[in-house]
A protein has these predicted regions:
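Hydrophobic transmembrane alpha-helix bundles
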Residues: 3-33, 114-127, 157, 162-165, ...
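Accessory, solvent-exposed terminal regions and/or long lumenal/extracellular loops of proteins
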Residues: 134-137, 142-231
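A short linear-motif detector with a strong N-terminal bias
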Residues: 33-36, 104-108, 163, 207
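Hard-cation-handling environments
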Residues: 1-86, 90
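Substrate-recognition/cap regions that form aromatic- and gly/pro-loop-enriched pockets
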Residues: 43, 48, 65-136, 142-147
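Short, flexible coil/linker segments at or flanking structured domains
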Residues: 27-31, 43-45, 114-116, 173, ...
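Flexible coil/linker segments and helix-coil junctions enriched in charged and small residues
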Residues: 23-26, 99-110, 167, 181-186, ...
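Sequence-level detector for tyrosine residue identity
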Residues: 10, 27, 39-40, 55, ...
Length: 231
């Protein structure tokens, strides 16, 4: 819905700069105006997310915990180790700024995928209900695709580093055995080679793909560490 408002201002004009000699913009205080302009008092969502019943924050992320506490977020610590079925995000894509802002190289255009998995919860990890006054803050910071999320502000950057890799001369035999023992994996592998010429021409990309689709691939790489409990 668009409404109209009366906007008051001053006419702009281009005048020679006394510093550079080039043209510069100056608002003429002797030429006030009042104009009717469009006022866009609504918005169209470019993305949406279903609000979970709660989030789970592992206690290792103490900096995030401190910021949540400073903003009045209510949290409850788990009293014992347990296993919970939770929605887990995986970081699929993001961009990173080439220049710093407030001491951070911010991420943007973050995209995630979601799946239900059983996750290990340790005593002391934090359960954060969304049924509280700080719900807006929680959504803006704990949802990684949100513009000002903790992920986009680099608080979870350690998940972006793959710490375990393979040695090609060793993994060649392992990769062959994996394909022989997993027909579905082999079918997906052959289909990928058929559809992607650049993949077909790169032996390393092929071994890397097999590695990342095997039990040898570290599960925490690119896995967003804050879990969601669906309603």
């Amino acid at each position: 819905m668009i409404t109209k408002i009366q906007f008051k201002g001053y006419e702009g004009e281009m005048v020679p700069s006394e510093v550079t000699g080039a043209e510069r913009l100056r608002y003429n205080r002797e030429a006030p105006f009042t104009k009717e302009v469009d006022y866009y008092n609504n918005f169209v969502a470019t993305g949406k997310v279903e609000i979970p019943k709660a989030y789970i924050l592992p206690q290792a992320w103490w900096e995030v915990r401190e910021l949540l506490e400073l903003n009045g977020v209510e949290m409850t610590a788990f009293e014992k180790d347990t296993v919970i079925a939770a929605q887990v995000y995986r970081i699929e894509d993001f961009k990173t700024s080439s220049s710093a802002y407030e001491g951070h190289y911010l991420h943007s255009d973050t995209r995630v995928s979601a799946s239900m998995k059983k996750v290990i919860i340790r005593k002391g990890d934090l359960l954060i209900s969304t049924d509280q006054p700080a719900i807006r803050y929680l959504l803006e910071t704990l949802e990684p695709e949100a513009v000002d999320s903790f992920f986009n502000w680099n608080f979870f950057d350690s998940i972006l580093q793959q710490k375990e890799h393979f040695s090609p001369y060793v993994f060649e035999d392992v990769a062959l055995r994996l394909l022989e023992e997993n027909p579905d994996l082999e079918d997906a592998f052959e289909a990928r080679k058929d559809s992607l010429p650049e993949f077909r021409s790169s032996w390393y990309a092929q071994l890397d793909w097999i590695h990342k689709n095997s039990r040898h691939y570290e599960p925490t790489h690119m896995r967003y560490p804050v879990f969601r409990l669906p309603r």
